[in-house]
Swiss-Prot record:
Family membership: Belongs to the transglycosylase Slt family.
Keywords, in A-Z order: Cell outer membrane, Cell wall biogenesis/degradation, Lipoprotein, Lyase, Membrane, Palmitate, Signal
GO term, biological process aspect, one: cell wall macromolecule catabolic process
Top-rank taxon, per record: Bacteria
EC annotation from Swiss-Prot or TrEMBL: 4.2.2.n1
Subcellular location(s) per record: Cell outer membrane
Designated name of the protein: Membrane-bound lytic murein transglycosylase C
Function: Murein-degrading enzyme. May play a role in recycling of muropeptides during cell elongation and/or cell division.
Stored Pfam families: Mltc_N (PF11873), SLT (PF01464)
Organism annotation: Haemophilus influenzae (strain 86-028NP)
Main location: membrane
MF annotations from Gene Ontology: hydrolase activity, acting on glycosyl bonds; peptidoglycan lytic transglycosylase activity
């Protein structure tokens, strides 16, 4: 099982985390939010260290759903990137059975779910994992009867045991997702994506490529930088820009951004801002697309500084280049390795979605 140390999340400021580098102030409200998040994650990690051991910290992230239950003695981990589900417990098998059922039947609404507490996630009549996992008989897991029978089968036939470094014994099951689970999740959001694409004039395949790279279509996605949801919008940077564009004050709340419709609208709005404001002077549409992708990750200012410290000069230089040259520079010269890799990943994902449309 893949382990995620909380401290390893600190350096990564995922999508929209740098906005436009236009001198945005980190105000008192943001400072309080950040301090609150630090306290919460500190308490959370202390509980995990105490129960699971110092090398067993597993936390929710952009492409990983992680939920602790039973006072942190049971946990469920859905890797949306790797396509695998692991559910494990240090308690009795009834707890494991319950966790399997609740994980398979969890809903898609992340607004009311606190991933940093140990309560059960409600069972939904419209499970988010429906179509992404099948039981031992190849059935879709659509209701509590099927989920319960599958949980019983897993415990009787697929149960595994491991010992933690702190001496505790863990019993767990592993459930693979179907081969095309990413595409199944993507289809769930196509109506919202198409609506936003038409509204803001942004290519549908670009939105899909960014969303896959950001969250692998995980509606519960969160990063330590407090990037939220499917398109990993950071409230105090890109979120503020989007609200300002819409004539609103302040910034979107976490609950607001955990709504898929709001999140997709905010992410695509930010792409519109990049396209029509921060990178407006770039004339070649392909060069602009490369710059937009890179800027979604590292900020428009950081992208332009790759070419020149002066914005107008940077845009002039970009306009003198072929798109292939712009792409090569952004994927080899950009000072952020994350930004370099980001453009490679999104461009590849976008091409895949273009072919499948």
């Amino acid at each position: 099982m893949k382990k995620y140390l909380l401290l390893a999340l600190l350096p990564f400021l995922y999508a929209c985390s740098n906005s436009s580098n236009q001198g945005i102030n980190y105000d008192e409200a943001f400072a309080k939010d950040t301090q609150g998040l630090d306290i919460l994650t500190g308490q959370f990690s202390h509980n995990i260290d105490r129960i699971w051991g110092v090398n067993e910290l597993l936390v929710a992230s952009r492409k990983d759903y992680v939920k602790y239950t039973d006072s942190f003695y049971t946990r469920s981990h859905v890797s949306f990137d790797e396509g695998n589900i692991v559910i494990e417990t240090q308690q009795d098998l009834n707890r494991l059975h319950n966790a399997i059922v609740h994980t398979l039947l969890m809903g898609a609404d992340a607004k009311g779910i606190d991933l940093f507490t140990s309560g059960d996630v409600p069972i939904s009549s419209r499970p988010f994992l429906l179509g992404q996992v099948v039981d031992h008989q190849g059935q879709q897991i659509a209701n509590q009867v099927i989920a319960s029978n599958f949980a019983t089968y897993l415990i009787q036939n697929k149960l595994q045991t491991r010992r933690l470094q702190n001496g505790h014994t863990v019993q767990f099951v592993s459930v693979p997702m179907i081969a095309n689970h990413v595409e199944v999740r993507a289809r769930k959001y196509l109506p919202l994506i198409r609506k936003a694409a038409q509204r803001y004039g942004i290519d549908e395949s670009l939105i899909l490529g960014i969303m896959q790279t950001e969250s692998s279509f995980n509606p519960y996605a969160i990063s330590y930088a407090n990037a939220i949801g499917l398109m990993q919008v950071v409230p105090h940077t890109a979120g503020r820009d989007v609200f300002a564009m819409k004539g609103k004050g302040g910034q979107p709340s976490t609950r607001y951004l955990y709504d898929p419709a709001n999140n997709i609208d905010a992410g695509v709005s930010y792409l519109w801002i990049l396209q029509n404001q921060y990178l407006d002077g770039i004339t070649n549409p392909t060069s602009k697309r490369f710059a937009m992708i890179s800027a979604y990750n590292s900020g428009a200012g950081a992208v332009l500084r790759v070419f020149d410290n002066d914005k107008d000069t940077a845009i002039y230089k970009i306009n003198q280049m072929y798109p292939e040259q712009v792409y090569r520079i952004l994927t080899t010269v950009h000072p952020s390795s994350q930004a370099r890799n980001y453009l490679l990943k999104v461009d590849k994902a976008q091409k895949k979605f273009r072919v499948r449309r």
